[in-house]
Amino acid sequence: MASVLLLPHQRRKHRQKRARTASYRKPMSQGSSPSPAMEVDGPEFPGKTGGQTIAEMGEERSGAGTGNTGTGGQSSVSGAGGKAGALNTAKLVLSHKPISTSSPEAMAAAQQVTPQKLAQLLLAKGPLAIRFITQALTEEIPSFKDLSASKQRRLIMGALEAGDQENSVVFAKIGWGQWSARHVKPHLFIKERELTNVANSKVKDAGVHEARRSSSNAKKGGKSGSFLNELKRPMLAAPTASIYIDENALASDDDEEDDEEDEHDMLNYENLKRRQPSVVAVEPPELSDQQEVLFRARLRAPNGGSRRRSTSKVRSVSVSKPGAHRAPPAAGDAVEGPLRRLSPSQADRKSTIDIATPEEPPHDELLSANSVAKTRRAAARRDSWLSRSKESSIRSTLLSHSNYNIVSPPSHAQPPADHHPLGREADHSDTDEEDWASIGAPALRNNSMPSNLSSSSSHHGNSASASNAHSEQGSPHARPLNYAIPNSIPPRQHSPPDAEDAAFLLMSLKS
């Protein structure tokens, strides 16, 4: 018997009922009448006997009452019968299985499914689907409904493919699962049946796919037919446009990668070309920029120690020239800019200390293609990593020390006598705080120098005195600031040792 799940409050009621009827549970015969002692009076059991109460309790607990629990009478039997009948019906429904194909009923039902019966059905009721044919045969054949669905379908399809040879009727599939019957000539029955079966197989294979394809296309077309049509047009022209754009992008990237190595050189070379006219400009600049130009000239004049400071002198010459805005340049001043541009590069190749040549080299040699190209490449490489702010800080710090040699760019071309005094007066008028002409090698030698730079100062004093004597013999107007050595002596002989060079660079970094 099936057990019934009870809730907590129902369990409490059952416990109370069991406690009240515990004393009345005694086996009784079915024909005996209930005793007065078994009558239960109270609000819960009004007018009920003990047997009825016990029977009801048995039904609630187990779902079916039995005669052993008491004198159940008709109520217990009827309750048990109702429950059992419902369960039996459910069991029959669940336990229903199609009959075996080898059973006599199945064989009799299969023999009744004939092409003649199907021909009569289809000719009378028109094209029908398989489900409607199955329903009609179920009504006509008693045992046909007990067969399995697959067995029913196989019987129907076999009869349709065989055809009604007696009546010369063939069955054709017209699509959507519907079948129709048509008469043919008796002598052409076999041929028509074969052709019809081949056509039916094709319709079965292609018809379903076409139906699905058409239905899916119709749904898609109804939702976004026009949108898809619009998208097809740009998609056709998209490959050509994308290829064109990609080719341009690749070409431009290749050009950038090819020019990446010489990027700084080209930019700086163009800047130097644009700045070159400012060196030989005839028209003076505005008065508002003169003070700034003079201040930069003062700061850049004493830079002549290391490669880094000599690099800044190239930038100072390219930006401004002291005599370019004070007076119109003479015939020789036009060459002075490029000459000053060449002197620092030669000094960088020969020594770490800026050494200028006292005599003027040939004009053609100075303006040769190799020297100009080397100078511009060297200046462009150094200017790429050197900033003006760093130059200004180094110059302002080095200017306060009197231990370094102050070397100005040499004048390689002497202007005529009538123009030279004007340039000198302008140079003297530029500085109010100190006279640059009075500063020379003797004044620097008299100053106290650190021990690590003593040899360097004596070396510069000797070279400066020699250059001073040579310049006085060559021209009475020679500037005392230009210190150099004769061309007969190679400049590399005057380069300091490695220890002095290292000490000089260390002092410049500390300052």
From Swiss-Prot:
Q: Which UniProt keywords apply?
A: Cytoplasm
Which spans does this entry mark as compositional bias, Low complexity? 446-471
**Membrane spanning residue stretches:** none
Q: Where is the composition biased (Polar residues)?
A: 394-408
Q: Where is this region: Disordered?
A: 1-82, 206-227, 298-501
Query: Can the keyword Cytoplasm be found in this entry's annotation?
Result: yes
Cellular component GO terms held in the UniProt record? cytoplasm; nucleus
Please give the InterPro entries that the UniProt record associates with this protein: Stb3
UniProt-annotated location(s): Cytoplasm
- List GO molecular-function terms, semicolon-separated: DNA-binding transcription activator activity, RNA polymerase II-specific; sequence-specific DNA binding; transcription cis-regulatory region binding
Coarse class of the primary localization is cytoplasm
A Pfam family of this chain: Stb3
Gly residues bias (residue ranges): 64-82
* Similarity annotation: Belongs to the STB3 family.
Q: What is this protein called?
A: Protein STB3
Name the species this protein comes from: Eremothecium gossypii (strain ATCC 10895 / CBS 109.51 / FGSC 9923 / NRRL Y-1056) (Yeast)
Show the taxonomic lineage.
Eukaryota, Fungi, Dikarya, Ascomycota, Saccharomycotina
